[in-house]
A protein has these predicted regions:
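Glycine-enriched, solvent-exposed interface loops adjoining structured elements
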Residues: 1-126, 130-203
Length: 203
């Protein structure tokens, strides 16, 4: 699915059962709360979380190998600066490697520290990578080889402002409209505490 922000807002309202039942009515808010803006904040947070944590098969993934800024240190460690639309790496491979990497270590774990030691640093048979957010460190490039990438697949945030995801994630938008669920949801609490004036358009 690929939806604009307005289409996503309409879908969100439908899934949360917030669309008016009677389309012949005009609704005017009297408490000054912009419900659409509240919902958009909720939507943007939901989508950001989806991009960070969902399986790569249901969120947009692109090969960004041609958009990387790459540097190679004397010890063969490759630093690749990722483009701003990249949310997280999925699978990367240097042409000199015998296999790709799909596990990207966080810099604060002990395994990442071992990679910086020349005696425990991996080679082309069992490469490794550390994710620093805006850059990826790749271990290691053999002497005499160029840092050419076969792939650098990343989950990306669409640059056109669209919401792109597999239709299967819509189940997560379904909201139980029981009293307890509405009490726990701040968006729905705002709706319940609001004042509406409904005017029949036939009058």
């Amino acid at each position: 699915m690929e939806l604009s922000e307005s289409e996503m807002l309409d879908l969100w309202k439908t899934m949360m059962q917030l669309q008016p039942a009677h389309y012949g009515c005009a609704i005017e808010r009297t408490d000054g709360i912009d419900i659409d803006e509240l919902l958009l904040i909720h939507i943007r947070k939901w989508y950001a979380s989806l991009l960070l944590s969902a399986p790569d098969g249901i969120v947009p993934v692109e090969d960004v190998k041609d958009r990387l800024s790459v540097m190679v240190a004397d010890n063969g460690v490759v630093t690749a600066m990722v483009p701003p639309e990249c949310v997280r790496p999925v699978e990367w491979k240097l042409k000199a490697w015998q296999k790709s990497v799909t596990l990207f270590l966080q810099p604060n774990v002990p395994e990442a520290a071992y990679l910086h030691n020349e005696w425990t640093r991996p080679g082309v048979c069992d490469p490794a990578a550390v994710d620093y957010g805006n850059r990826i460190l790749l271990f290691t490039l053999p002497d005499g080889e160029l840092p050419i990438f076969d792939m650098a697949r990343c989950v990306v945030r669409p640059t056109n402002g669209k919401y792109v995801f597999h239709a299967s994630v819509l189940e997560s938008l379904r909201v139980n409209r029981s009293t307890s669920q509405r009490r726990d949801d701040p968006i729905l609490r705002n709706l319940d505490n609001s004042s509406f004036r409904v005017f029949d358009d036939l009058i």
